[in-house]
């Protein structure tokens, strides 16, 4: 159990048989009446966001999530298959469970698979990944005075903005949290 006073961004709780992650929280102490905590909760499985208010100090069941480092091995009939490299046990996740993470997911990549009650819920990517640029406009000499950017399509199909000097075939480092270019990779 966790007190509503201890809510922080990223805290996971159990409500109505589902796992919810605290996205935002605000402790409110009105002049009259008792204090309360106003939260925005995101359903880990479904992805929907709801607002919920808790009394200050209210005890809520905390969802204890397990993380396992698994390797993405292949796709089969729309499912993503991950393998535990120590036990060779396979875990399957649907495209909905993976969500936006699939735009940076490639075969052979190690990721954290988050489970609750031994059911896989979601995939956590590393903060940065190295991917090859598959398609981008050529940089024109003299265009770099303002340090502009151009769109690039990566090997996984993701599209991000890169500096003008990046060309097709280069490996770049991408921040998976905000879809931004971090630099070239050798």
Swiss-Prot record:
GO terms for biological process: peptide biosynthetic process. It is found in: Cytoplasm. PROSITE patterns: EFP. The keyword Iron-sulfur does not apply. One of its GO terms (cellular component) is cytoplasm. GO terms for molecular function: translation elongation factor activity. The keyword Cytoplasm applies. CDD domains: S1_EF-P_repeat_1, S1_EF-P_repeat_2. Pathway: Protein biosynthesis; polypeptide chain elongation. Its main location: cytoplasm. InterPro entries: Elong-fact-P_C, NA-bd_OB-fold, Rib_uL2_dom2, Transl_elong_fac_P/YeiP, Transl_elong_KOW-like, Transl_elong_P/YeiP_cen, Transl_elong_P/YeiP_CS, Transl_elongation_fac_P. Keywords: Cytoplasm, Elongation factor, Protein biosynthesis. Pfam families: EFP, EFP_N, Elong-fact-P_C. Belongs to the elongation factor P family. Involved in peptide bond synthesis. Stimulates efficient translation and peptide-bond synthesis on native or reconstituted 70S ribosomes in vitro. Probably functions indirectly by altering the affinity of the ribosome for aminoacyl-tRNA, thus increasing their reactivity as acceptors for peptidyl transferase. This is Elongation factor P. It comes from Prochlorococcus marinus (strain SARG / CCMP1375 / SS120). The lineage of its organism: Bacteria, Bacillati, Cyanobacteriota, Cyanophyceae, Synechococcales. The gene is efp.
